[in-house]
Amino acid sequence: NLKGKVLKSNFKFDFIYDKNYLKIDNLFFRDKDLSFKSIGLIELKPFFKASLNSEIKEIDLIKLKKLEYGDFVKLKPFIKRLNIQNNIVFKSKKFSRNLIDNLNLKVKTAYGRLNIEKNIFILDTKIYCKNDINLLDEFPILYFNCELNSPNKKRLLKKVKIDHKKKDDRLELNFLGNLNILNKKINFDSVSLKKNYKATEEDLKYFKKTFENIFLAEEFFKLFQLSKLRKFIIEIS
């Protein structure tokens, strides 16, 4: 059993060490902005590789918004060496004001390339996304391919405080594109609703312009703000 403290962060975990691997059980990390539990196996030889399962207990996205790209650049030599697979789970506390109820992530990092599969649950709505990005590029581009499936559009929009008149209106949305984080530019390759709508080139340009004006005019991480999401939905509706 190992306990420790780094700056204002506390951690503890049980482990079994062998010259070729380190098995971790009951890891618990906590500071004022983030706490999580984790178990997994870290292979030390012949190459470093980590396979983990983690559960986020608490996270403060306000701090995430304060991250600067300069801080990230300093980590690039370290990121290049990472070879990690991590399954991450987050469940919102009952009666919390979080938009997201449950979040499941499958994260793979190798040689600077990050691949993420996301399952996001908001009430009875499910959002599935596949993302990939090369973190070592001078201008990293995040590619996304997402599906939103909601059996009740009215209930979903009510969650983001938008009034919707129709009852029990199903919503099935697909959107594909890429986001240049540093240049604050987004491109939509396709946007479609099942059966009855596929965005034209003019529509895609309008979505691009609206998204950039609302989400990317300020710091990138401000796109987490619910007010901006609400404004974007109203603009494109």
Could you describe each region identified by the protein language model?
Residues 1-123, 127-237:
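Membrane-proximal interfacial segments on either side of biological membranes
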